C-alpha cells in the first residue's frame, strides 16, 4: 500500500500590533531582539551577523544596520509600536533606537535596564596599555 503524502500546513505568521525591542549594547557587539508583549522572540540581528567583524562590530553604524535588519524581519508580523529596553554601555545604544524609529516603528517608551551593582563584586583591575 502506497502512502499518500501528507502535506505540511503552511505556517501562518501571527499578527502582532505592538511588541518590545531589547537592545544589548556591549563594548564589542550589539544584539537587537524584537519580541511580542509576552517576550517571545519575533526576530533578532547582531552587528557581527550583519557582516561586521573585529573592531568595526563595535561601532554605532554596525548597531544601526543590525537594528534595521531586525526591524525588517519583524515587519512581517505586522508590528507597529515598540517599547525599547536598552541594556549595556556600548556605543550602539542611541543609533539602534534611531534606526528602529526610522524603520517605521512608533517608539512608545525607552527604558534603560542596565544592571547596576549596589557595590557587589570587585571590578576587574585597570588595563595597562
UniProtKB/Swiss-Prot annotation:
Pfam families named among the record's database cross-references: Ribosomal_S11
Family: Belongs to the universal ribosomal protein uS11 family.
Keywords: Ribonucleoprotein, Ribosomal protein, RNA-binding, rRNA-binding
SUPFAM superfamilies for the chain: Translational machinery components
Cellular component GO terms held in the UniProt record: ribonucleoprotein complex; ribosome
Matches recorded under InterPro entries: Ribosomal_uS11 (IPR001971), Ribosomal_uS11_bac-type (IPR019981), Ribosomal_uS11_CS (IPR018102), Ribosomal_uS11_sf (IPR036967)
Oligomeric and partner information: Part of the 30S ribosomal subunit. Interacts with proteins S7 and S18. Binds to IF-3.
Gene Ontology BP term (one): translation
Residues annotated as signal peptide: none
Gene from which the chain derives: rpsK1
Protein name: Small ribosomal subunit protein uS11
GO MF, any single term: structural constituent of ribosome
Entry superkingdom: Bacteria
Source organism (scientific name): Psychromonas ingrahamii (strain DSM 17664 / CCUG 51855 / 37)
Function text: Located on the platform of the 30S subunit, it bridges several disparate RNA helices of the 16S rRNA. Forms part of the Shine-Dalgarno cleft in the 70S ribosome.
Amino acid at each position: 500500500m502506497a502512502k499518500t503524502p501528507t502535506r505540511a500546513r503552511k505556517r501562518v505568521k501571527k499578527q502582532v500590533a505592538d511588541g518590545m525591542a531589547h537592545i544589548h549594547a556591549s563594548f564589542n557587539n550589539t544584539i537587537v531582539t524584537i519580541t511580542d508583549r509576552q517576550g517571545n522572540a519575533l526576530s533578532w540581528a547582531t552587528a557581527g551577523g550583519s557582516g561586521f567583524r573585529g573592531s568595526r562590530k563595535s561601532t554605532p553604524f554596525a548597531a544601526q544596520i543590525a537594528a534595521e535588519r531586525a526591524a525588517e524581519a519583524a515587519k512581517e508580523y505586522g508590528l507597529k509600536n515598540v517599547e525599547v529596553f536598552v541594556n549595556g554601555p556600548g556605543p550602539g545604544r542611541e543609533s539602534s533606537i534611531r534606526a528602529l524609529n526610522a524603520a517605521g516603528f512608533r517608539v512608545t517608551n525607552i527604558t534603560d535596564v542596565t544592571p547596576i551593582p549596589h557595590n557587589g563584586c570587585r571590578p576587574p583591575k585597570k588595563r595597562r596599555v
